[in-house]
A protein has these predicted regions:
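Blade-level signature of beta-propeller repeat domains, shared across WD40, Kelch, NHL, RCC1
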Residues: 358-419
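Conserved blade-ending motifs and adjacent loop-strand segments that build the rim/top face
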Residues: 247-249, 297-312, 341-368, 405-410
């Protein structure tokens, strides 16, 4: 946009289209530029992305608002520190520190959710159909299941395999698998199974080196579990994996594979594996070597008050040997858990999904191709209805200091420095004046309080002519 005050002309170029408007500009002292909704003429406006607002005068750059880092609704320009105010903004940079809800649903029917990491697609599997949610655009497709059944109709027992492009419904206690071909719209299992799961809230992860899914622990029928299972892609059988020494039974721990080892963090349970005994959180990181079958405690934290009810998976960050995991603390919060030290830190703002639930599918997913992390919270309430919410957060992750805009000290106006100097100088004079007044008052009081008589002398002056 170019303002020609001399010729009363505004030239606007938008989307490679030029527009010229004749407006009385001579004598104008202030100009307000609004991007988005106009408070004077329109009530609705389509959302738009804005960045890099620049103002030039006679070819010189006098203002530049990047609209990236900010302080609440205020953004400072890079030239003079001038303020730009946004009304009800949605800052894209905040998507790197805050979870954004991309889907919500309440339903009374049975539901399970799986994720396709390659295409960022969610599969919401119901009894006779599958809804496919695009995690990027938010678009929804539907397919009708023509025949067959999943092996488990409860939450937390569904995965998507990107190698075969199939949905896997699995039952750990029955060691059965049913495959859904999206193209053929058919489950491979011909008989319906209605058994309740024995392994609610188990940890799960995928091992690319042997193309297998691994599942650990869980809860069901008043017992905590510590069994380890494997499902190799392309087979229809789940097999148990032996290891020793045994890890204490638990549920709601997070799992990831690094090299030959399966790592487990957090969870809740007890050594006996029975609900009648007191349960507690496990503030520890354990590992199972999948080649040797040997388990170990990597580290254990003695005291903590954090809630270590974790999403079923976590993801390894090799740059600093840490894991990204999600805790139920504060209704959902992303943590960085360090492999070589008993430390975890919060790296996102909490979601605060504090709805009370009876059961929950709490699943954490990563889509590296789209540079996004996703979280599924499927809360089953006491009336057995589902309250489903799906959240996303962008990577790389940022912290508050990286999105907060700090005013450049070099941009402070000169008059402000003069004003500060005058205030300081005036304060110094006032301070000295008070000290002198204090001394004079003290001398006067000393004279008045003395008992020595005061003599008065009279002088007569004469002037000789």
């Amino acid at each position: 946009m170019h303002l020609n005050i001399k010729n009363n002309q505004i030239d606007l170029k938008y989307d490679d289209k030029d527009t010229t408007m004749i407006v009385p500009l001579q004598g104008t002292e202030d100009i307000t530029v609004l991007f988005g909704k106009s408070p004077y003429f329109s009530s609705d406006v389509a959302p738009m992305n804005i960045r890099d607002i620049k103002i030039t005068c006679d070819g010189d750059l006098i203002r530049h608002w990047k609209l990236w880092k900010h302080n609440g609704e205020v953004c400072l320009d890079e030239v003079k520190g001038a303020r730009a105010m946004a009304s009800y903004p949605s800052w894209l940079i905040d998507d790197h520190i805050e979870w954004r809800k991309i889907y919500a649903e309440k339903t009374s029917g049975r539901l399970d959710v799986a994720f396709n990491a390659r295409d960022a697609l969610f599969y919401l599997v119901r009894q006779d159909k599958v809804d496919i949610l695009n995690g990027i655009s938010g678009n929804m497709d539907k397919i009708t299941v023509e025949k067959g059944y999943p092996v488990m109709e409860y939450t937390d027992h569904l995965v998507y395999d990107t190698l075969t492009n199939q949905l896997f419904s699995y039952s750990l206690h029955e060691k059965l698998v049913s495959f859904l071909s999206v193209d053929e719209r058919t489950w491979s299992l011909s008989e319906r199974h209605l058994d309740e799961p024995r392994y609610y809230n188990h940890a799960r992860t995928f091992n690319s080196s042997d193309s297998s899914f691994y599942f650990f622990g869980g809860y069901g029928f008043y017992q905590y579990r510590n069994d380890l299972y494997r499902l190799k892609v392309g087979t229809k059988q789940i097999e148990g994996v032996t290891y020793s020494p045994a890890i204490s039974p638990r549920y709601s721990s997070a799992a990831a594979i690094v090299g030959d080892e399966l790592y487990l963090f957090g969870g809740r349970g007890n050594r006996q594996g029975k609900q009648e005994f007191n349960a507690h959180f496990y503030y520890e990181l354990c590992a199972i070597n999948l080649k040797t079958g040997k388990s170990r405690c990597v580290w254990k934290k003695r005291q903590s008050t954090d809630i270590l009810m974790m999403a079923s998976s976590m993801y390894f960050e090799p740059s600093d040997s840490s894991f990204y995991a999600v805790s139920m603390k504060d209704g959902g919060s992303l943590w960085k858990v360090f492999m070589n030290d008993s430390v975890w830190v919060e790296v996102s703002k909490p979601i605060h999904n504090d709805l009370v639930y009876q059961d929950c599918d709490f699943s954490f997913y990563s889509s590296p191709a789209h540079r996004k992390l996703y979280l599924v919270m499927d809360k089953i309430l006491s009336d057995r209805t589902h309250d489903v919410a799906i959240y996303s957060i962008n990577t790389p992750l940022l912290n508050d200091n990286e999105i907060m805009q700090v005013a450049d000290k070099s941009l402070t106006p000169v008059w402000l420095w003069w004003l500060c100097g005058i205030v300081l100088l005036g304060g110094a004079f006032f301070f000295i004046y008070r000290i002198k007044c204090g001394k004079n008052r003290a001398i006067s009081e000393d004279i008045k309080s003395s008992d020595t008589p005061i003599e008065t002398f009279h002088f007569s002056e004469s002037v000789e002519e």
